[in-house]
Amino acid sequence: MIRKIPSFIEVYKSLIQIPTISSNNKLLDQSNKNFIDLLSNYFSDLNFSVKNYQIPHTDKYNMLACVGSGNGGLLLSGHSDTVDFDEKKWTKDPFKLTETNNKFYGLGAVDMKGFFALILEVISSINIKKINKPIYILATANEETDMSGAKNFIQSTIIKPDCIIIGEPTSLKLINAHKGHMSYSIKVIGDTGHSSNPDHGVNSIEIMHDVIRSLLILKKYFKEEYQHPNFSIPYPTMNLSSIHGGSAINRICPLCILNFEIRPIPGLTLTQIEIVIKEKLETIMKKWSHRIFIKKLFSSVPAYECPHNSGTIKIVEKLCQLNSAAVNYCTEAPFLQRIAPTLILGPGSIEQAHQPDEYLEHYFIQPTKNIITKLINKFCY
């Protein structure tokens, strides 16, 4: 096949140099349109049909590229956005791909713009005219915040591939399950007053003490009632993350705020957790209904699992000579899993993601290309 796009390195450089930061801080959040436009052009040059979809009420976009027709096939998926960064902690330019010591440095180098560069490198070297089933490439928006890109995609798409591979950095280990994530903030409003007469007002810290006691009972309940042997920590976890209250030693505390998170295992739904939280806090909430307020901090992510008896897992395990495993971090898999069996498999280590001087090690390049080629050959030819 005659190459129609720049070299792997040139493509990789061009993807890194476009900022695509997603952040809940509006001052840091950026559109990914320029990145999506560039990626779309690359796939168009390789004879893919490309459609870009704007996420409603945002300046963020998804891209779906396709070559071939019919049912089934393979979907290779990744997110276009990165986290923000602390410039003081970086020793290299985050938006310039730097190759040194057998590593590629740059913001998004491993999480996960390198995966797109590798897909393009493989596609540019194979004869796509002979495929029997479609190859899909999905680039999503806002994975690093609310995952609205993946959520929007599954609501609108009609495609039904045989297999979805998300190229998150797994050190090329095959992942078929991960925990979910829920985060909450509880605010307790008390009374202000002089500490010389502490019974003259309601102390928010004292109410929060009862709230925490109820949450710790819930934490124990999760640990005792729910187990999944494939996880290194085999039960749902709860972490009381931060607590703030009070302003002076001689003042009744008028406000106390507690933030906490829960990481559910597969089999424990977000709805179940919400119901149990309400049950455990019901008594104290009724007693102090006008003083206790609870809200979600961020969009929740369900736990995910592609069952071991799935034919897709068996095919990919045999094809790549890998055994599937479970991890504790979150991806878009629970959403994409709703349209087709989904697995997570990609180059680089998760330990380098979201870190200063983020990098992808060079030795992942050829094995990743080999795996992508095998997947395309298996599901599309």
From Swiss-Prot:
Pathway membership, UniProt: Amino-acid biosynthesis; L-arginine biosynthesis; L-ornithine from N(2)-acetyl-L-ornithine (linear): step 1/1
Name of one Pfam family that matches: M20_dimer
Active site: D81, E143
Cofactor binding description: Binds 2 Zn(2+) or Co(2+) ions per subunit.
GO BP of this protein: L-arginine biosynthetic process
Main location: cytoplasm
MF term (GO), any: zinc ion binding
Catalysis: reaction(s): N(2)-acetyl-L-ornithine + H2O = L-ornithine + acetate
EC numbers for this chain: 3.5.1.16
Keywords from the UniProt entry: Amino-acid biosynthesis, Arginine biosynthesis, Cobalt, Cytoplasm, Hydrolase, Metal-binding, Zinc
Cofactors that this protein relies on: Zn(2+); Co(2+); glutathione
Subcellular location, record wording: Cytoplasm
Self-association state and partner proteins as the record states: Homodimer.
Job of this protein: Catalyzes the hydrolysis of the amide bond of N(2)-acetylated L-amino acids. Cleaves the acetyl group from N-acetyl-L-ornithine to form L-ornithine, an intermediate in L-arginine biosynthesis pathway, and a branchpoint in the synthesis of polyamines.
Family: Belongs to the peptidase M20A family. ArgE subfamily.
Protein name as it appears in the record: Acetylornithine deacetylase
Originating organism: Buchnera aphidicola subsp. Acyrthosiphon pisum (strain Tuc7)
Lineage start: Bacteria, Pseudomonadati, Pseudomonadota, Gammaproteobacteria, Enterobacterales
Gene designation per UniProt: argE
